[in-house]
Design a protein with these regions (language model features):
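Catalytic alpha/beta core domains of metabolic enzymes, predominantly
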Residues: 122-245, 257
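Histidine-centered catalytic micro-motifs
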Residues: 8, 27-32, 42-54, 79-84
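N-terminal small/glycine-rich loop or linker at the start of catalytic domains
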Residues: 1-22, 86-95, 125-132
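Alpha-helix-loop-beta-strand connector modules within alpha/beta enzyme cores
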Residues: 8, 55-84, 147-154, 206-217, ...
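Glycine-rich, proline-tolerant flexible connector loops at the mouths of alpha/beta enzymes
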Residues: 18, 43-67, 133, 190-191, ...
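Flexible, glycine/charged-enriched surface loops at secondary-structure junctions
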Residues: 44, 79-81, 162, 273-282
């Protein structure tokens, strides 16, 4: 039986500090969270960064560089996956939707990948969704995705294609067909975002069955769906992700105090089902890094 790759997404950009006092915010806190997750069984860490003074999402190269330096100083084997998600949110002005409202983060797509070009992590995310997100809209147009993918390829980084709905997978197939992205690809299904993929087994089975032959895939669930999707993904032959980007509760009403706790819970679930987690080096071989 193949081992399972566990990714830990330690902070994200939508989880807010006021939601939990345990959210990693500073570069050192984020790096320490990654190292703790690795000790608990994570083979990969998915990293966003924040402004240390406010906890708000950052796109600053120096913040990413400091986190990576702190991780590599203590753990050179851990696979680092940097986000490219920030920079795609549009908030319309009430009464004049042509005008951006506060909260809009839209920027040049090349700005969204400049840290990837500079730091060259082994993996980075590449969101393929254009969708409603609460009262806002997330926009990743095919042309912008292609511009970002070109930079990612030139940096020698593997893109992790994040899929929020079935149409995103059709875009991924087009990117492979025209040579923008190498096939069969690495995919992550994002389950439970409002107006995105549902968290029922039938949805995950359908998405898995639409993948190109030979594709590697993972899935994760948002909030209360986190641990059910751990089990569903494993049962369907996929890899898994947990972390405070996606969920801040260990159980109903009980905040997790660390990302390592979430990793440990997922590890136990996989073990109870008869599986084993892959080490970072084993994951590296499985992914062809």
């Amino acid at each position: 039986m193949n081992k399972t790759i566990l990714t830990c997404a330690v902070t994200g950009n939508l989880t807010k500090p006021e939601m939990t006092p345990y959210l990693p915010i500073t570069p050192k806190q984020i790096a320490d969270a990654c190292l703790g997750a690795a000790d608990a069984g994570a083979a990969v860490v998915h990293i966003h960064v924040r402004y240390p003074e406010t906890g708000k999402p950052s796109m600053e190269l120096d913040h990413y560089a400091e986190v990576m330096h702190l991780i590599k100083a203590q753990n050179k084997e851990l696979i680092i996956n940097l986000t490219t998600g920030p920079g795609g949110r549009y908030v319309p002005t009430e009464g004049d939707p042509k005008v951006f409202a506060p909260g809009t983060t839209l920027c040049d797509p090349l700005k969204r990948v400049e840290h990837v070009a500079a730091l060259k992590p082994e993996i980075c995310s590449l969101d393929l969704n254009t969708m409603n997100s609460g009262a806002d809209v997330v926009m990743n147009t095919p042309s912008n995705v292609r511009k970002m993918a070109k930079v990612i390829r030139e940096a020698g980084v593997m893109p992790e294609l994040e899929i929020f709905d079935s149409g995103d997978l059709n875009l991924a197939k087009d990117l492979i067909a025209d040579g923008t992205v190498d096939g069969p690809g690495l995919y992550t299904f994002v389950m439970g975002v409002k107006y995105g993929l549902n968290t029922d087994p039938a949805t995950l089975l359908y998405m898995r069955d639409q993948l190109p032959s030979g594709a590697l895939w993972a899935a994760f669930g948002i909030s209360r769906a986190e641990f059910p999707i751990v089990a569903q993904a494993w049962l369907l032959g996929g890899h898994i992700r947990v972390g405070m980007e996606d969920n801040i509760y260990l159980e109903k009403g009980v905040l997790c105090e660390s990302n390592a706790q979430l990793v440990s819970r997922a590890k136990r679930i996989i073990g109870d089902l008869g599986g084993q987690l892959a080490s970072s080096n084993e994951a590296r071989q499985m992914l062809g890094l």
